[in-house]
């Protein structure tokens, strides 16, 4: 395994299929452009899948979990034990993403990269447990270099399993108490933006809690700020095991030619890191929604992303991405199933 495998070449979209899909859209029985962004979504998927009529029948959902040492600074409204407790909920079918994956006919993989509280072996959970959570990043780097590399590789391996299953779309989700703090710190470093613009309530902090969270991140940036220009160092110093796995998954999707649907704030920060590690992966990332965390908008703008939904979501788990899948499927169905003007014997407008 190359220590910097993420620099490997990404697959390219098929320009011929993009052209053919665009031509088909222009021949369908509707005014050109009348289906708005659904038309471009179908065209983009055609180019990425190399098929004039793309399909999203087979989905893969992985939730990556990991705890964060910065929780010791009092930055979360919930105790750290919740991370492990939610793993049980995921595999027992009671979490939001469990319900949504079931409704979509998608399998759900759960990967424990580093819960702070050891868990019993749970059927349906891959217990990698690279560490008992990250270190407190106001005192030291969140991860060692080897831990970060292993977490990136865990994301890559999840995509490999998705590919072997014949999946056409990858959704990554996350679970980790304290991970909005890590995501905000990473976003500040990667965007060179003020902390106040990128920090929000996470799982439910009040105004004083947000102010404290802001101060904690400012301390972390003061400690690690000299490494802002290096996305790998930013990831390992300020990120989390699950965030690294997400970044690795997005990079692997681009290298294998699988579309990734990016969820909320934390996933979008992981995507931003992936793009900084290998800019060519950007074409393979679709963005599901614009979430309630104030920093999410800034990250999406930096990625020139056009999210599909805006529902005020802030749950994570991959839930927002799962909610956007029916929209993508309908875009594909319209593109493939509508008749052309010639097929329907309907008069087109004059050329």
Curated annotation (Swiss-Prot):
Reaction(s) the record says it catalyses: 5,6-dimethylbenzimidazole + nicotinate beta-D-ribonucleotide = alpha-ribazole 5'-phosphate + nicotinate + H(+)
Keywords noted in UniProt: Cobalamin biosynthesis, Glycosyltransferase, Transferase
Active-site annotation: 317
UniProt pathway annotation: Nucleoside biosynthesis; alpha-ribazole biosynthesis; alpha-ribazole from 5,6-dimethylbenzimidazole: step 1/2
Gene3D superfamilies for this protein: 1.10.1610.10, 3.40.50.10210
Matches recorded under InterPro entries: Nict_dMeBzImd_PRibTrfase, Nict_dMeBzImd_PRibTrfase_bact, Nict_dMeBzImd_PRibTrfase_N, Nict_dMeBzImd_PRibTrfase_sf
SUPFAM superfamilies recorded: Nicotinate mononucleotide:5,6-dimethylbenzimidazole phosphoribosyltransferase (CobT)
One of the GO BP terms on file: cobalamin biosynthetic process
Molecular function terms from GO: nicotinate-nucleotide-dimethylbenzimidazole phosphoribosyltransferase activity
The EC number(s) this enzyme carries: 2.4.2.21
CDD domains for the chain: DMB-PRT_CobT
NCBIfam families in the record: cobT_DBIPRT, PRK00105.1
Function of the protein: Catalyzes the synthesis of alpha-ribazole-5'-phosphate from nicotinate mononucleotide (NAMN) and 5,6-dimethylbenzimidazole (DMB).
Similarity annotation: Belongs to the CobT family.
Protein known as: Nicotinate-nucleotide--dimethylbenzimidazole phosphoribosyltransferase
Species of provenance: Pseudomonas aeruginosa (strain UCBPP-PA14)
